[in-house]
UniProtKB/Swiss-Prot annotation:
The keyword Membrane applies. This is Neuromedin-B receptor. Residues 1-41, 100-117, 178-211, 288-299 are extracellular. The chain crosses the membrane at residues 42-65, 80-99, 118-139, 157-177, 212-235, 267-287, 300-327. Residues 1-20 are annotated as: Disordered. The modification Phosphoserine is found at residue 352. Glycans are attached at residues 8, 192. It is found in: Cell membrane. Brain (olfactory bulb and central thalamic regions), and esophagus. A lipid is attached at residue 341 (S-palmitoyl cysteine).
Length: 390
């Protein structure tokens, strides 16, 4: 039988009524399998997938952070946020994924009360850092494309770094209740045996899981996604309008700026798409269980859906470096140079990916055929680049 980290939903009704389905992000329930083949596959395949996720994720995210820290040309506002994403992913890969993989080798929760308090909070913190950073990145792209003249020209790296720290502070604070209410409980079984499990809320009534799942879905998925969608609606509208209304004398200059900004907007949008694709099944599954925990199918099919959703959610922590590698020429060159025996990174001077730090002409895309709004800001050698160095 698969490891019993959580209550078995196939228990009699009397027992089920007093046992609440734990959070899908922490010590998920695995239904009983009907044979040893499924058990063998689960115990071998899933931990192997987790090992691949951890290895690939650590390599990609560590390399990403190293490139941004060691190359001054890569230190831009968006890259600070992208590094923040990588840091959150590293936290998840180093803590939550190994703990989750251990469920396939142990039948009970083996990390004690302290682990039960910390692991759920760490995972929620990591998810918060990811989704809030993606929202901040979308807001940055909105300002760069729709309102470029509203962007700061001095102290921007410090200010952006403070924003990144603020994202971590908010994410930790929002995860505090998870640490407060998570507890190790002994769960009874229909064969008069019992096992310990870590659950994220008190075992009192069925209202707690419903409130918990709805809040998680709203705060860590739906609300940020709506905000990001609004930003990208205005970004798309501005880019489409500017493509038709730019006069001929500004076409060449503004076309390069538009391509640079559109490229970064595309990268951020891919990050958002990966996050939605990887986490949406987990959120939906948790909502379904929270509102129908007495009726959940304990079959092998339901177990497979659970495992797929779980693997997908953790996979999100290793996909961003791949997306960046495919979409960013400069990151790809730096990454390849790091892999090739630590050779010196390529100096980044490509105007299609990096704006000069000595003089940057910031042109508003809000223009029309009759009245072109063209604003220029000259930045000295110590000023910070407003566009991504990708």
């Amino acid at each position: 039988m698969p490891p019993r980290s959580l209550p078995n939903l196939s228990l009699p009704t009397e027992a089920s009524e007093s046992e609440l389905e734990p959070e899908v992000w922490e010590n998920d329930f695995l239904p009983d399998s009907d044979g040893t083949t499924a058990e063998l596959v689960i115990r071998c395949v899933i931990p192997s997938l987790y090992l691949i996720i951890i290895s690939v994720g650590l390599l990609g995210n560590i390399m990403l952070v190293k490139i941004f820290l060691t190359n001054s040309t890569m230190r831009s506002v968006p890259n600070i946020f992208i590094s923040n994403l990588a840091a959150g992913d590293l936290l998840l890969l180093l803590t939550c994924v190994p703990v989750d993989a251990s469920r396939y080798f142990f039948d009970e929760w083996v990390f004690g009360k302290l682990g039960c308090k910390l692991i759920p909070a760490i995972q929620l913190t990591s998810v918060g850092v990811s989704v809030f950073t993606l929202t901040a990145l979308s807001a940055d792209r909105y300002r760069a494309i729709v309102n470029p003249m509203d962007m700061q020209t001095s102290g921007v790296v410090l200010w952006t770094s403070l924003k990144a720290v603020g994202i971590w502070v908010v994410s930790v604070l929002l995860a505090v209740p998870e640490a407060v209410f998570s507890e190790v409980a002994r769960i009874g079984s229909s064969d008069n045996s019992s096992f310990t499990a870590c659950i994220p809320y008190p075992q009192t009534d069925e209202l707690h899981p419903k409130i918990h799942s709805v809040l998680i879905f709203l705060v860590y998925f739906l609300i940020p996604l709506v905000i990001i969608s609004i930003y990208y609606y205005h970004i798309a509208k501005t880019l489409i309008r500017s493509a038709h209304n730019l006069p001929g004398e500004y076409n060449e200059h503004t076309k390069k700026q538009m391509e640079t900004r559109k490229r970064l907007a595309k990268i951020v949008l891919v990050f958002v798409g990966c996050f939605v694709f990887c986490w949406f099944p987990n959120h939906i599954l948790y909502l379904y269980r929270s509102f129908n925990y007495k009726e959940i199918d304990p079959s092998l099919g339901h177990m497979i859906v659970t495992l797929v959703a779980r693997v997908l959610s953790f996979s999100n922590s290793c996909v961003n470096p791949f997306a960046l590698y495919l979409l960013s020429e400069s990151f790809r060159k730096h990454f390849n140079s790091q892999l090739c025996c630590g050779q010196k990174s390529y100096p980044e001077r490509s105007t299609s990916y990096l704006l000069s730090s000595s003089a940057v002409r910031m042109t508003s895309l809000k223009s029309n055929a009759k009245n072109v709004v063209t604003n220029s800001v000259l930045l000295n050698g110590h000023s910070t680049k407003q566009e991504i160095a990708l």
